[in-house]
């Protein structure tokens, strides 16, 4: 391994600790490093979107790290490309740049046949920090299907808006040209269609249909894991569509390289375009989602009620909207106005359940009681070890046991920066491997919080 690429590997280790996992997977992980002339370092980005983002957000930090790691740091260059050893050949179905061949003639697929939900549009999608990158990428794909970011791979937890964005792209494509053949489906439907085709000796028709599409939108791609024949068929469908410059969008609950039971060649192809994450929405976005949904339902929702619901329902958009619909239904059936007190009563069983879930607040309380200090000590600026170590433990537990982002955890600990949280998590991880006392404390606290 050359010196520049060896330094890059060390740099990646620091970046992995400093950057939230979803950001690292989206922006840093797709980069390839190769040694260039005169001991320089060439970083290859898979597309313009990643290259621009690295230039704007991460290049300064990468340069700083390389300066710290070497007395003679390599000169960095950024460009679009991939390592020649990993460049797909024509035989491996690299997406070609020739003019796309017209799909076979056939009946136009309607919105209904395409399984596209006309209510899921970009206009009805509430944008926030947690999803703005995914929305921006989806918008680009909708404007230039088959050209910008193909495939587009969106990953994140349940109920965060992945499917909404997928439908929004489908709606936009069909609105521009209703003759386009667009299909949205769950990955299990693809498997079921293939099995049915095998049973009826109709694989040629199956292949002809799927490979004639202008846009294929597949949800929950992780369900292909362990299904070898389905993966084989999807592999060839994927290649055929990309060769014809037809758009593919995939969603998953995890980063593609983390899907156990998925062939490496598929994982590799999923990274040919752009991979973006959607994270749980922050408080302001949750409030905006509730206000937008209430407006769609033509219901007046006081802002303080939206704030109350958003503060207590933090997991995902689906549960947030479910809570709102319950409040609206109760108000409709009882004829009462929607107030904070009414909402608290309407959601009392849900709020009781939420209260039993692990929150940053009860982590702080549990850690403070365990170490016999005050919660206020965890939030204060004091740095003596008797307080600093419990604070680091509490931050690490909050990252492990809640869905909160690093900035949100930092805010909950006296307005600290997210890098402080990262340092705390790294320190606790290090101590767990070297200190039996810290390991015992960690196990005890996990048992208390999980029990």
UniProtKB/Swiss-Prot annotation:
Nucleotide-binding as UniProt keyword: yes
Gene Ontology annotations for the cellular component aspect, listed alphabetically: cytoplasm; plasma membrane
Region (Domain II) location: 72-114
Region named Domain III, AAA+ region: 115-331
Database matches in CDD domains: AAA (cd00009), Bac_DnaA_C (cd06571)
Domain I, interacts with DnaA modulators as annotated region, ranges: 1-72
UniProt-annotated stretches for the region Domain IV, binds dsDNA: 332-451
Keywords tagged on the record: ATP-binding, Cytoplasm, DNA replication, DNA-binding, Lipid-binding, Nucleotide-binding
UniProt feature, compositional bias: Polar residues: 81-90
Residues reported to bind ATP: 159, 161-163
GO process annotations (BP): DNA replication; DNA replication initiation; regulation of DNA replication
Pfam families per UniProt: Bac_DnaA, Bac_DnaA_C, DnaA_N
Compartment(s) where it occurs, according to its Swiss-Prot or TrEMBL record: Cytoplasm
Residue ranges, annotated region (Disordered): 81-106
Molecular-function annotations in GO: ATP binding; ATP hydrolysis activity; DNA replication origin binding; lipid binding
Domain notes: Domain I is involved in oligomerization and binding regulators, domain II is flexibile and of varying length in different bacteria, domain III forms the AAA+ region, while domain IV binds dsDNA.
Function: Plays an essential role in the initiation and regulation of chromosomal replication. ATP-DnaA binds to the origin of replication (oriC) to initiate formation of the DNA replication initiation complex once per cell cycle. Binds the DnaA box (a 9 base pair repeat at the origin) and separates the double-stranded (ds)DNA. Forms a right-handed helical filament on oriC DNA; dsDNA binds to the exterior of the filament while single-stranded (ss)DNA is stabiized in the filament's interior.
Subunit structure of this chain's protein: Oligomerizes as a right-handed, spiral filament on DNA at oriC.
Cited NCBIfam families: DnaA
Family per similarity comment: Belongs to the DnaA family.
Listed name of the protein: Chromosomal replication initiator protein DnaA
Source species: Coxiella burnetii (strain RSA 493 / Nine Mile phase I)
